[in-house]
Amino acid sequence: QPNPDEFVGLM
């Protein structure tokens, strides 16, 4: 499961 922190990095 992807971490929220990494998802923010994509943004």
Curated annotation (Swiss-Prot):
Q: Where in the cell is it found?
A: Secreted
GO cellular component, as recorded: extracellular region
Question: What processes does the entry annotate via GO biological process terms?
Answer: defense response; neuropeptide signaling pathway; tachykinin receptor signaling pathway
For this protein, the record's Pfam families field holds: Tachykinin (PF02202)
Key word Secreted present in the record? yes
Q: Which domain of life is it from?
A: Eukaryota
* Recorded coiled-coil stretches: none
Alphabetical UniProt keywords: Amidation, Amphibian defense peptide, Neuropeptide, Pyrrolidone carboxylic acid, Secreted
InterPro entries on file: Tachy_Neuro_lke_CS (IPR013055), Tachykinin_dom (IPR008215)
Which cysteines in this chain are paired by disulphide bridges? none
Q: Which residues carry this modification: Pyrrolidone carboxylic acid?
A: Q1
The UniProt family comment states: Belongs to the tachykinin family.
So what does this one do? Tachykinins are active peptides which excite neurons, evoke behavioral responses, are potent vasodilators and secretagogues, and contract (directly or indirectly) many smooth muscles.
Q: What is this protein called?
A: Kassinin-like peptide K-II
Q: Which organism is it from?
A: Pseudophryne guentheri
Source organism phylogeny = Eukaryota, Metazoa, Chordata, Craniata, Vertebrata
